[in-house]
């Protein structure tokens, strides 16, 4: 009772210096797409700024290590010197939403300083399987439904992708989708906020 502050995740709470001891975790939310299914495209998507911690470099190295029939798309703020990636620079939300529905796999290779991961939820909600570095924030976000590789480790990522080649991808995506529907749907998060306001 009498919560004085909120945070979107345990990781955000741990990194904050000004929160009171009475802090409730209330995550970000998304509007769940109820008319979506796994997209059986074997392409890869990265979303994030072209800066070290977002680790576009690993995504580029992945593109050099995989069958050339796969398409690699990066929605980012500046182009790197690599012709295997299709770069989409500072596109609109509508353009992003159109692209994200036609990929298959979302790669989240960030190396540090992540407190949540809303783009991961958006990707799953658009019919993609999310494959994430094993940051605490991402493990907290997806729990047992997540597909993880060792932080900044290309060989670990390739091993995970190779294992997925022999897996039931529909089942994996459904587990991720059900997880985000249960934990991050707008009504659930709204109920959490109402609870906090009622306990001020």
Where are these regions (language model features)?
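Nucleotide-activated donor-binding/catalytic signature segment of Leloir-type glycosyltransferases, i.e.
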Residues: 74-98, 105
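Conserved acidic donor-binding segment of nucleotide-sugar-dependent glycosyltransferases
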Residues: 132, 146-155, 161-168
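Short glycine-rich donor-binding/catalytic loop of glycosyltransferases
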Residues: 111, 128, 132-142, 151-152
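Carbohydrate-associated surface elements
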Residues: 11, 29
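Acidic donor-binding loop of glycosyltransferase active sites
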Residues: 101-115, 128
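A charged, aromatic-enriched C-terminal amphipathic alpha-helix characteristic of glycosyltransferases
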Residues: 34, 53, 167-200
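Conserved donor-binding/catalytic core segment of Leloir-type glycosyltransferases
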Residues: 6, 30, 36-54, 60-64
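Short alpha-helical segment that forms part of, or immediately flanks, the ligand-binding pocket
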Residues: 97, 120-125, 136-140
């Amino acid at each position: 009772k009498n919560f004085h502050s909120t945070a979107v995740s345990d990781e955000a709470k741990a990194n904050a210096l000004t929160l009171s001891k009475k802090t409730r975790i209330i995550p970000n939310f998304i509007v769940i797409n109820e008319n979506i299914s796994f997209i059986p495209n074997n392409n890869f998507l990265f979303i994030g700024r072209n800066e070290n911690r977002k680790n576009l470099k690993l995504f580029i190295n992945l593109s050099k290590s995989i069958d050339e029939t796969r398409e690699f798309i990066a929605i980012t703020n500046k182009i790197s010197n690599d012709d295997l990636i299709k770069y989409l620079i500072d596109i609109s939300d509508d353009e992003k939403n159109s692209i994200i529905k036609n990929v298959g796999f979302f790669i989240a290779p960030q190396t540090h300083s992540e407190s949540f991961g809303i783009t991961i939820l958006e990707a799953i909600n658009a019919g993609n399987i999310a494959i994430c570095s094993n940051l605490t924030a991402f493990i907290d976000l997806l729990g047992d439904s997540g597909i993880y590789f060792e932080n900044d480790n290309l060989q670990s990522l390739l091993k995970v992708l190779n294992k997925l080649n022999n897996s039931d991808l529909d089942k994996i995506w459904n587990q991720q989708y059900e997880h985000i529907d249960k934990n991050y749907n707008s009504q659930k998060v709204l109920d959490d906020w109402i609870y906090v306001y009622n306990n001020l």
